A protein has these predicted regions:
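Single, function-defining residue in the core of a domain
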Residues: 1-173
């Protein structure tokens, strides 16, 4: 840790976090770790963090395309269909993937969540959808069965079970 305040920025509470996603790049040093929540997920920031020889860890946003191939023509993977079909008994799935239309390489980790956690996530999502006059798709309900993370930290540095633990530390840092 640098142990110093590098930047202070006040914004409208309704401003999107993505607009600030690149602000950290000039401050990065080799081997720094950038922990991000969904609001800061921008593919360009992931590229620039890696270009600085730094590390990133973020949750995966549902709308981001994921592919097993770097080819831009390769189809996006339907994760909620892929995992049960190809990894029916795995509690943690660890894959090298390419994300977004730009096919940014990264490591995807999917943790199957315990039933009680899945039920609570679905209950909250259903409540939120009702408030907005929407319905939850089955695909989104299935998505809520997993904790999904993307990182550029290799498996040799962080074994699969470590990634979720490190991400949870984010709340202790903030």
């Amino acid at each position: 840790m640098h142990h110093s305040l590098l930047e202070r920025y006040l914004s409208d509470g309704t401003a999107a976090d993505q607009g600030r996603a690149l602000a950290i790049v000039p401050h990065l040093r080799q081997d720094d770790l950038v922990l991000r929540d969904l609001g800061y997920l921008r593919l360009e920031s992931l590229r620039q963090i890696e270009a600085q020889d730094a590390w990133s860890l973020s949750r995966l946003s549902k709308g981001v395309d994921v592919s097993l191939e770097a080819d831009a023509q390769a189809p996006a993977l339907g994760l909620v269909e892929h995992f049960p079909r190809d990894y029916p008994d795995e509690s943690v799935i660890d894959l090298s993937v390419f994300i977004g239309h730009e096919r940014v390489p990264c490591r995807l980790l999917a943790y199957r969540l315990p039933d009680h956690v899945v039920q609570e996530r679905r209950r909250k999502a259903l409540e939120e959808a009702r408030k907005k006059g929407r319905k939850l798709s089955q695909e989104y309900r299935d998505w809520l069965s997993f904790g999904l993370y993307i990182t550029n930290v290799t498996q040799q540095v962080w074994p699969p079970k470590v990634v979720g633990t490190v991400y949870r530390l984010r709340w202790q840092v903030e």
